[in-house]
């Protein structure tokens, strides 16, 4: 029960990240990319400090939600900044390159976290979040704003909903958006429960950092391969093939889980 409650700290981070996406985009369209990223990093660092100093689980859960909310800023706006400068297949290649970097970071993160746990406990691990927040904020301040003045949009609520309506009415955009939503929903659910499953189901809790790093290697490798494939294949076809692969693998995992009473073989999982 305690491990389940503690896993909420991870889950709430991703929930906050999902909620933050609805605010980061409209704010960046009105104010520009740089101010929103820098502001997000300031909130990110403050939430990291609050998490490190939290006197109770309630405070920890709240600060983790805020932390995730702030993390949505650079995550969302990095893609927006690419769209400001690229389009078509070139944009897809840059996006997959970004995904490679995004997935490579978690390879070293568990190792750093384990090191801080050995040195000073979980509070040190939480407090470490201040360092990347400062680095990203300083770096963003040194680059040019990518959103042209003529492309800025009003922050009026009606204009914001108008933008959502335009996206919803575009069948292609809405379809891909829905697919990405379900895909990332499953992925974030997996991330939020991985440590709990390794510890309570497979008794590998002490080796979580190792398995997580291995998983990140394959994710980064997949993104790198996708970047190369996009030089010879259209983004639409690659997305279709990836979607088919996800459906087939997901169905296979469900069958394996049912066949083994909810506990599929570890190597398959």
Where are each of the predicted segments found?
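Extracellular/periplasmic helix-loop-helix junction of adjacent transmembrane segments
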Residues: 1-18
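Residue-level signature of mid-helix packing/kink "hotspots" within the transmembrane helices
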Residues: 14-22, 106-107, 216-224
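Conserved MFS/SLC helix-loop-helix module at the cytosolic interface between two early adjacent transmembrane helices
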Residues: 18-58
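Helix-to-loop junctions at the C-terminal end of transmembrane segments
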Residues: 21-31, 222-236
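Structural signature of the two symmetry-related core transmembrane helices
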Residues: 35-49, 130, 238-253
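Helix-loop-helix hairpin linking two adjacent transmembrane segments in secondary transporters
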Residues: 59, 88-89, 96-141
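Cytoplasmic helix-loop-helix junction between adjacent transmembrane helices
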Residues: 63-102
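Juxtamembrane intracellular "pre-TM" segments in multi-pass secondary transporters
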Residues: 146-176
């Amino acid at each position: 029960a305690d491990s389940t409650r503690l896993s909420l700290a991870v889950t709430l981070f991703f929930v906050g990240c999902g909620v933050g996406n609805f605010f980061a985009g409209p704010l960046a369209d009105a104010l520009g990319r740089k101010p929103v990223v820098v502001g997000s990093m300031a909130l990110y660092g403050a939430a990291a400090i609050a998490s490190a100093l939290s006197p109770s689980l309630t405070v920890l859960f709240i600060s983790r939600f805020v932390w995730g909310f702030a993390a949505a800023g650079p995550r969302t706006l990095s893609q927006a900044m690419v769209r400001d400068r690229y389009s078509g297949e070139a944009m897809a290649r840059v996006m997959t390159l970004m995904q490679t970097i995004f997935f490579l970071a978690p390879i070293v993160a568990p190792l750093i976290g384990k090191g801080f746990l050995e040195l000073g406990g979980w509070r040190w691990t939480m407090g470490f979040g201040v360092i990347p927040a400062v680095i990203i904020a300083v770096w963003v301040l040194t680059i040019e704003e990518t959103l042209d003045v003529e492309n800025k949009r009003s922050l009026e609520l009606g204009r914001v909903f108008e933008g959502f309506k335009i996206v919803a009415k575009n069948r292609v955009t809405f379809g891909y958006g829905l697919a990405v939503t379900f895909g990332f929903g499953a992925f974030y659910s997996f991330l939020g429960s991985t440590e709990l499953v390794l510890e309570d189901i497979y008794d590998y809790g002490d080796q979580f950092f190792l398995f997580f790093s291995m998983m990140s290697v394959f994710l980064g490798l997949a993104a790198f391969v996708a970047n190369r494939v996009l030089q010879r294949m259209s983004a639409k076809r690659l997305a279709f093939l990836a979607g088919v692969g996800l459906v087939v693998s997901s169905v296979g995992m469900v069958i394996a889980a049912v066949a083994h009473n909810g506990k599929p073989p570890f190597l398959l999982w």
